Amino acid sequence: MERKHMNVASFNLDHNAVKAPYVRLADKKIGSHGDVIYKYDIRVCQPNREQMLMPALHSLEHLLAELMRNHSDKILDISPMGCQTGFYISLLNEPDYQVMLHLLETTLNDILAAEAVPACCEEQCGFAANHSLSGAQEIARYLLAHRNKWEQVF
């Protein structure tokens, strides 16, 4: 049976066929003034088989959001997936996939050196008690150890 095409690009991806971890261009949108948004799927865990624990995922989100912007002003958004298997990272007007890979690798190394989770307090975070720096660093270490797999999605 053929599946209906969905409006959300990731819903059209066969989640059983992918091999995490990987980094793939998930979507590209061209604005009315010519700006282009590149949305990347940063998949950490194998869909429907494993997921990141929430405190580690939450801290990794904060660390990526803060530290990646030290390396590029083209970062629009970093969003965790509800399924807890990865993140979406959106870049503005940066078409080079290798630049995205370098940004991620550099930022993951920054995370390994981090001594605290940024904005990990009730004033700056909606669930400040739900963080794990060591958990985020474990995920960063895992991704860096599997760097050679990032470019192969299937």
UniProtKB/Swiss-Prot annotation:
Keywords: Autoinducer synthesis, Iron, Lyase, Metal-binding, Quorum sensing. Its cofactor is Fe cation. Fe cation binds at H58, H62, C125. GO terms for molecular function: iron ion binding; S-ribosylhomocysteine lyase activity. It catalyses: S-(5-deoxy-D-ribos-5-yl)-L-homocysteine = (S)-4,5-dihydroxypentane-2,3-dione + L-homocysteine. Its EC number is 4.4.1.21. The keyword Lyase applies. Binds 1 Fe cation per subunit. GO terms for biological process: quorum sensing. Pfam families: LuxS. Signal peptide: none annotated. Belongs to the LuxS family. NCBIfam families: PRK02260.1-4. Involved in the synthesis of autoinducer 2 (AI-2) which is secreted by bacteria and is used to communicate both the cell density and the metabolic potential of the environment. The regulation of gene expression in response to changes in cell density is called quorum sensing. Catalyzes the transformation of S-ribosylhomocysteine (RHC) to homocysteine (HC) and 4,5-dihydroxy-2,3-pentadione (DPD). This is S-ribosylhomocysteine lyase. The lineage of its organism: Bacteria, Pseudomonadati, Pseudomonadota, Gammaproteobacteria, Cardiobacteriales. The gene is luxS.
